[in-house]
């Protein structure tokens, strides 16, 4: 038996089995990106929709950096922001329209309404996830206009 035949009969089937095994193992476990998406959406729901600091803080890293200029850093900054929302906008809800993940970042495209007659706001929230915890947040907020120059909508 020559080297090519040995390869064909032994090495190639073993390599194929290894590739299939790795693919099956990967399919059985959620990817890190999917896990990060879950963490960000559950954190968002607890903090913004339910306004539940105790639930939201379970997802918070020990050092939470905030880039929204109206919110302070850290757990106490988040607590104060949730208290503000609960007091000032108790009916505010965010409907997550899209979730995008890349590396350690998760982006939420959200339609936020306050339970009044206004069309709400379009919000893009960006969360950085580290070791399964939310450690950083950015956002961009835009009012949804009553009339637009096109019929495409914001969502």
Predicted regions and their residues:
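Bacterial N-terminal signal peptides that target proteins for export
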Residues: 2-15
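C-terminal and inter-domain tail/linker signature
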Residues: 26-155
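Bacterial N-terminal signal peptides
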Residues: 13-23
């Amino acid at each position: 038996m020559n080297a090519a035949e040995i390869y064909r009969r032994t090495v190639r089937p073993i390599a194929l089995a290894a590739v299939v095994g790795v693919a099956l193992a990967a399919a059985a476990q959620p990817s890190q990106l999917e896990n990060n998406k879950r963490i960000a959406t559950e954190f968002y729901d607890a903090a913004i929709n339910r306004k539940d600091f105790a639930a939201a803080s379970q997802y918070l890293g020990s050092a939470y950096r905030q880039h929204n200029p109206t919110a302070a850093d850290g757990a106490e900054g988040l607590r104060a922001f949730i208290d503000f929302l609960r007091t000032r906008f108790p009916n505010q809800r965010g409907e997550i329209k899209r979730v995008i993940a890349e590396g350690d970042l998760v982006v939420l495209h959200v339609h936020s309404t306050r339970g009044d007659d206004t069309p709400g706001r379009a919000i893009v929230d960006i969360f950085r996830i580290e070791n399964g915890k939310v450690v950083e947040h950015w956002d961009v907020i835009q009012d949804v206009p009553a009339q637009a120059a096109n019929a495409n909508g914001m969502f």
